[in-house]
Amino acid sequence: MINLRKTHPLMKIINHSFIDLPAPSNISAWWNFGSLLGICLVIQILTGLFLAMHYTSDTLTAFSSVAHICRDVNYGWLIRNLHANGASMFFMCLFLHVGRGIYYGSYLYKETWNIGVMLLLTVTATAFVGYVLPWGQMSFWGATVTTNLFSAIPYIGQTLVEWAWGGFSVDKATLTRFFALHFLLPFVIAGLTLVHLTFLHETGSNNPLGIPSDCDKIPFHPYYSIKDILGLMFLLLVLLSLALFSPDLLGDPDNFSPANPLNTPPHIKPEWYFLFAYAILRSIPNKLGGVLALLASILILLVIPFLHTANQRSMMFRPISQTLFWILTANLITLTWIGGQPVEQPFIIIGQPASILYFPLIHHPMPSAGLFENYMPKPKW
């Protein structure tokens, strides 16, 4: 009897993507985050769908509808906590996934990498419009400050801001369109994910050594499907611990107050996963310069494939590049910390050098280190 999963038109696609997919035999747990991101996306879409059934995108009732979900809807508190903390887990997996791509040279699959950067931008936009929906103080002022950045664009800036707002300030029209975008964009992300996977399966996965592995591949199932389930257990453990024991740990206390245009919070800050870019924005005194640096902080990822100069793909046996990578990681953690602090000394004087260091770390030392490592003495076995 012919195996149905290998002949059926639909099951054949699933089989080639998740069951009989040839995978390198030596990929480590760092390759787990792709599947975890897919699971995070499914969790966010499902919990978001149930939240959308009870949420009202009106400035007068949005805040109270979120309170109603938490108090009156069966397990509404759990769905909301899973959705809010699920976003944090999503970004944690996303940053680790990108970091693994840089460390092991996966960016040399240019199409897959570029689609990945598009995915990162789309997820960032989705998270931003979603943060506005509870219509608390930080939601309102975060939306006002962030959308106002478009006014730095010469000539068309102010028109663009008013077009985004749907009026002359952040109001009902803004909330309605942000809700529509927040509902729609996850499905765009799902579509881009399929494109990302299509390009990945054209080349096959990279591996820690960064060498071709066509001669030594194993089927994805059961080897890596079981391995991914272990990662999923860890993800669910952290997510449920957050959602059940400390649901507001990563949130902002100001968001427990309804939005008030007449009262500005003492310190406006976005969610933790935007803080590194927010710190770079704040470190530059010029508004247009800050906006350009904010965009460049993510778009610089598109340049990385063209800066690869080493003979070896992976950083596994490149000690100088490894050192620079971990300096960059420490720099990003510093920027995340600074972004959450008020604009005062000593945070200003720490944030500015960290912001200045971020771009040259990627642009100059990494290609130079690659060239230098090509001529390092090789061990004689």
Swiss-Prot record:
<feature type="transmembrane region" description="Helical">
    <location>
        <begin position="226"/>
        <end position="246"/>
    </location>
</feature>
<dbReference type="InterPro" id="IPR030689">
    <property type="entry name" value="Cytochrome_b"/>
</dbReference>
<keyword id="KW-0472">Membrane</keyword>
<keyword id="KW-0813">Transport</keyword>
<feature type="binding site">
    <location>
        <position position="201"/>
    </location>
    <ligand>
        <name>a ubiquinone</name>
    </ligand>
</feature>
<feature type="binding site" description="axial binding residue">
    <location>
        <position position="182"/>
    </location>
    <ligand>
        <name>heme b b562</name>
    </ligand>
</feature>
<dbReference type="InterPro" id="IPR016174">
    <property type="entry name" value="Di-haem_cyt_TM"/>
</dbReference>
<dbReference type="InterPro" id="IPR027387">
    <property type="entry name" value="Cytb/b6-like_sf"/>
</dbReference>
<dbReference type="InterPro" id="IPR036150">
    <property type="entry name" value="Cyt_b/b6_C_sf"/>
</dbReference>
<keyword id="KW-0408">Iron</keyword>
<feature type="transmembrane region" description="Helical">
    <location>
        <begin position="33"/>
        <end position="53"/>
    </location>
</feature>
<keyword id="KW-1133">Transmembrane helix</keyword>
<dbReference type="Pfam" id="PF00032">
    <property type="entry name" value="Cytochrom_B_C"/>
</dbReference>
<dbReference type="InterPro" id="IPR048259">
    <property type="entry name" value="Cytochrome_b_N_euk/bac"/>
</dbReference>
<feature type="transmembrane region" description="Helical">
    <location>
        <begin position="320"/>
        <end position="340"/>
    </location>
</feature>
<keyword id="KW-0249">Electron transport</keyword>
<dbReference type="Pfam" id="PF00033">
    <property type="entry name" value="Cytochrome_B"/>
</dbReference>
<comment type="subunit">
    <text>The cytochrome bc1 complex contains 11 subunits: 3 respiratory subunits (MT-CYB, CYC1 and UQCRFS1), 2 core proteins (UQCRC1 and UQCRC2) and 6 low-molecular weight proteins (UQCRH/QCR6, UQCRB/QCR7, UQCRQ/QCR8, UQCR10/QCR9, UQCR11/QCR10 and a cleavage product of UQCRFS1). This cytochrome bc1 complex then forms a dimer.</text>
</comment>
<feature type="binding site" description="axial binding residue">
    <location>
        <position position="97"/>
    </location>
    <ligand>
        <name>heme b b566</name>
    </ligand>
</feature>
<keyword id="KW-0496">Mitochondrion</keyword>
<dbReference type="InterPro" id="IPR005797">
    <property type="entry name" value="Cyt_b/b6_N"/>
</dbReference>
<feature type="transmembrane region" description="Helical">
    <location>
        <begin position="77"/>
        <end position="98"/>
    </location>
</feature>
<feature type="transmembrane region" description="Helical">
    <location>
        <begin position="113"/>
        <end position="133"/>
    </location>
</feature>
<keyword id="KW-0999">Mitochondrion inner membrane</keyword>
<dbReference type="InterPro" id="IPR005798">
    <property type="entry name" value="Cyt_b/b6_C"/>
</dbReference>
<feature type="binding site" description="axial binding residue">
    <location>
        <position position="83"/>
    </location>
    <ligand>
        <name>heme b b562</name>
    </ligand>
</feature>
<keyword id="KW-0479">Metal-binding</keyword>
<dbReference type="GO" id="GO:0046872">
    <property type="term" value="F:metal ion binding"/>
</dbReference>
<feature type="transmembrane region" description="Helical">
    <location>
        <begin position="288"/>
        <end position="308"/>
    </location>
</feature>
<protein>
    <recommendedName>
        <fullName>Cytochrome b</fullName>
    </recommendedName>
</protein>
<dbReference type="GO" id="GO:0005743">
    <property type="term" value="C:mitochondrial inner membrane"/>
</dbReference>
<keyword id="KW-0830">Ubiquinone</keyword>
<feature type="transmembrane region" description="Helical">
    <location>
        <begin position="178"/>
        <end position="198"/>
    </location>
</feature>
<comment type="similarity">
    <text>Belongs to the cytochrome b family.</text>
</comment>
<keyword id="KW-0349">Heme</keyword>
<feature type="binding site" description="axial binding residue">
    <location>
        <position position="196"/>
    </location>
    <ligand>
        <name>heme b b566</name>
    </ligand>
</feature>
<feature type="transmembrane region" description="Helical">
    <location>
        <begin position="347"/>
        <end position="367"/>
    </location>
</feature>
<dbReference type="GO" id="GO:0008121">
    <property type="term" value="F:ubiquinol-cytochrome-c reductase activity"/>
</dbReference>
<keyword id="KW-0812">Transmembrane</keyword>
<dbReference type="GO" id="GO:0006122">
    <property type="term" value="P:mitochondrial electron transport, ubiquinol to cytochrome c"/>
</dbReference>
<dbReference type="GO" id="GO:0045275">
    <property type="term" value="C:respiratory chain complex III"/>
</dbReference>
<comment type="function">
    <text>Component of the ubiquinol-cytochrome c reductase complex (complex III or cytochrome b-c1 complex) that is part of the mitochondrial respiratory chain. The b-c1 complex mediates electron transfer from ubiquinol to cytochrome c. Contributes to the generation of a proton gradient across the mitochondrial membrane that is then used for ATP synthesis.</text>
</comment>
